[in-house]
């Protein structure tokens, strides 16, 4: 009697359940809305990292670009992504608070992100209450910079009707509003923007508290063993030459183990 192919497959799977290849691990990437980069540039950056993680996990890691914050929020809410690299912090931390994801790593060099409040050289502002009745420009309202500005105002008990807030999409557009009188104060977290502004004689009168900004989070659906292997692979990249080549491609110095107490404090401060 001939053994039908389907029956044979069932027998093989019963005897050798580990013979099927593991499903792809879905790795979503969301970069900030206030930086300008093409999808191809972002994908090219992260493919070597995906390959390195795949080697550590012995399974294929598939990169999925999710540029829009609301799109990644929707996917995270359904735990469609096994692993996610997310800039900005508030999107990642909302999922950490919800318990659907855990922080695996922070990005080295991006653990103390601060907002600078810039003014023209003759401005006399010294404290946040000095902003009352004035116009403040921030990047995109759903950028981490804008979220941090709102946290600063809330902490200082300044109501939303006491400061007029204008928004512009990109960080490097903020000085334009100050130069041409469309705003009195400009908020940015881009060091290059701050340097250019102060080099021209402008001032920074106040800085925010700092928060980590670029997060690696992992779905709580993954096993503890897989979570640990991903974290170990990330934080040890800088220790080997192949790992440093991966970091060179992605454009970061490395990844570090997070401090969960800092995450908890940031969740509270940002009002998530």
Residue ranges, per PLM feature:
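Bilobed "Venus flytrap"/periplasmic-binding protein-like clamshell domains
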Residues: 32-52, 56, 89, 113-176, ...
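Acidic, polar ligand-binding/catalytic clefts
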Residues: 66-130
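A ligand-binding cleft/hinge motif common to bilobed small-molecule-binding domains
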Residues: 88-98, 150-151, 155, 176-207
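Extracytoplasmic small-molecule ligand-binding "clamshell" domains
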Residues: 23-92
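Short helix-initiation/N-cap motifs at beta->coil->alpha
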Residues: 63-74, 161-176, 211-212
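Periplasmic-binding protein-like
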Residues: 23, 29-35, 109-119, 198-238, ...
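Bacterial N-terminal signal peptides that target proteins for export
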Residues: 1-9
